[in-house]
Amino acid sequence: MAKSFNEITFKYKTNFINRVSLFVSIFLISTIGLSIFSLLNSGFRSEDAFLTNEDIFEIIKFTFVQSFFSVFLSLLLGFLGAKILFDIKSVLFKKIVISLTSIAFVLPTVVACIGLIKVWGGDGVLHLIRLSLNLNKNELTLYGLFGILLAHVFFNAPLFLRVFYNCFQIIPVNYLKNANQFNITGIRFFKLIEWPFIKETLPLLCGVVFLQCFTSFSLILMLGGGPSATTLEVAIYTAVRYDFDLKSAAVLASFQLFICLIVILFLDLFSSNKISNLQIKTNYLSYNLYKKSTFKNNIQKFIILLAYFLIIILPLIALVVSGLSLKIFEILKNQNTYIVFLNSIFIAIISSFITVSISWFISETRANIVMKYDNAFKDILMKKFINLSIMLYLAVPAIVLGTGLFILLKGFVSYNYFPILILIFSNVMLCLPFSVNIIQSHSIYLRRKHDKLCSSLGLRGWNRFIIIDFPAMKNVFGLSLGLCACLSLGDLSVIALFGSQNFQTIPWLIFQYMSTYRINEAASVSCLLIITCYLFFIFFSKMLGSKHVNN
């Protein structure tokens, strides 16, 4: 009796790849768990704490408030922007707006802060316009809650816009015709036509954005403005770096871990929902074909598009204009600049290749499980365990991870190497969810396409990978490497804890310039960082899959 197809196609991969994936998952979870335990253990054993219960309550309250309003404003602006974008007939205009707003997805947080300061800050474009019009009364202060909300909307409103716009694209034409025929508008149109197509993605999307805002660090650190606008993550950073108050850090970390784990469990409830609405269907059908444009609608469109211009597009323009100045030549003459860039590039390359390697093993393991239609309980358990190892970093503050590993390894690793190791580990954990999602769908596709052929030809193990899988996935590996390199180059979280004059990265150099109010120098370094990210992305894409760069 011939063996089943599953036995033939899986036996060459299951043993080795699944074991490697399981080992990596155990290592990641154990490392994060031990780092948390070491911080909590050291913290709760300490006797002194600078923060009172009232201080901790205020910090938690502000963290919730800024996260809630950030999600609400991003959702509102994203939804209205998607409706207006879908109303506009010009395909070219749609592509330009989507392209410009999508830059925020890969823009480092420190770079975005520079752009917002150049527009909304004390010497920004809007301040100069107010002065010229004698409107300098009741001036808004960028630093504080307003700046935090502005920065979070800068990053998250384009995400909501893209998702909602894709949802609107799959609304059947008949729905729009019938709505126009029966004069269904306003709230009724939203309830009957739009809501059924966005309700499945909304809880998951809001949960992810809330988690990002709740654990935000770089934006709060640079735009918070003081103790009155401090979140849990920044409070942990302050307690550890400036006061070395491990007890307060442990208490704050416990609250943050508990809240984030609850949110992750909430997300897991909706992870089984169908999210095909996230897939783009290029259908440039417009509501304008079926409803009349009025003066009121035109005013609403103008206001929303103006908000997008002031919050997202104008900061990008101001950053480029201010960064590409004579200051950039002074920075390039400084030898320390090259050392900082080499440090960042070295860490980004190492982190990217480690991340993509781990992602491939994990993706193949998950593909093995998906391809087995008769999954056993142990397969489901392994999949959940691997998913936990990928997503756990979202719940763990980077400062907690760095501090815990420092306490755990300070007797075993020299401090000269410690920042490098922590940066690489945190970058891998940061990039892993994105890299796995990029690679996994292609792994499953190749398994379904080539498994029978490889079984008949006897291609197994590394022979199959070199001959079949790698050539077909070069573009995916290039995309993943480029994205991981960009994310690694722009991360400020861990280096903010361990950065010093002896070891610096590009985000830390930008933060140092901003701390001394040298905004023009910070803008110039930010432009160099953007150029470096772009070159990395193009290099990896061209090197591995030039035919598929656009994909």
Where are these regions (language model features)?
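Short cytosolic juxtamembrane segments of multi-pass membrane proteins
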Residues: 3, 275-289, 369-377, 459, ...
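Short juxtamembrane loops and helix-capping segments at transmembrane helix boundaries
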Residues: 46-51, 127-139, 230-239, 326-336, ...
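Solenoid-repeat scaffolds in large eukaryotic assemblies
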Residues: 179, 248-249, 454, 521-523
